[in-house]
Each structure stands twice: as structure tokens, then as C-alpha cells.
Amino acid sequence: MKILAVNRELKQPINDFVGVDVIPDSAMIQDGKPFFVPDFFNQWCYYAVLAFRVSRLGKNIATKFAHRYYDAVALAVRTSPVVTMPISTAVTTAFDGAFICGAWTQIDKLNENPRISIGDKSISISTANLLINDSVAYLSKYFTLKIGDIIIPAKISIESEIITDTVVVGK
């Protein structure tokens, strides 16, 4: 299992110049296990993301068929250090605990514009802006998608000082 994260903001288009982080399954925390801030950097940033679970094997998937290749969505958090010098992407994105995954919800139970709340901050997300089908097509050009893989189509920016509780409303 691997986690493929497209490095783009919510409203940015997907093109051949967008970066992709490949995150190993060892970086994932799930099932309510605690997260501890690592001590190898002083400052950390957190990105809320919607993660999509791949449900079938595929390679070179056309955008019009991409919806057949994922079956569930979860709210997740990507953790990365704030760095001012060039450093290996693996160190900043693939360490143990870099990806915190919530409970999976069947994709058909999610409405068109889910709302994500973090503490007292909230944002509505247009699923059209996520470009999940475009992300599946783009990623499958370079990677074989396997059952259980996770795709993160975009970062979701919510200004908040401390993440205390996260909820997806609209399922």
C-alpha cells in the first residue's frame, strides 16, 4: 500500500509539472492511535486533506473511468516540518506519523459539497475543485494503482493555530 499525494492547492489545475509525494504505509497513523510531534524539527505545519481509497487495480486510467477506481473517503492530516534549507522530500513527508488518517466513509454517502471543521474554523469544499478523477488519471500514468492505495488530490488550507478536533459534515 502506498499513499500518493498530489502537491497542489485546492483550486490549482493538474498538469504535468505538479509534484507528487509517495508516502509509505509506515508513515500512516490510523484507528485512533496517538500522534506525537517528532523532535527532529522545531516547527511543524499541518494540512487537512481528503483521502480517497483505491478499490481496484489500474494503470493508465482515462479520466472518464476514474470514478470506478475509488470507493471511500476519509479526512486526514499531513504533517511536515517547516524548513528553510533544502532537504530530502522523504525526510519531510515520509517519516513515521507524517499522515494521520480518519475513519473511511463510502463515497456514495458524501454529498457534493462537504464541510470540514477544524476547531472553530470551517470550510465548504466543492468536490469539483478536488479533481479526484483527474488525479486518478494523472497518477495512473506513472504508478500502478493497487487496491488499498490512498490518493490525496489536493491540500485544503484552513487558517487555524491549533488542531483540536476535525470533522467532515455532509456524509
Task: Cite the ranges covered by each PLM segment.
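Catalytic-core "active-site belt" of small-molecule-metabolizing enzymes
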Residues: 1-150, 157-171
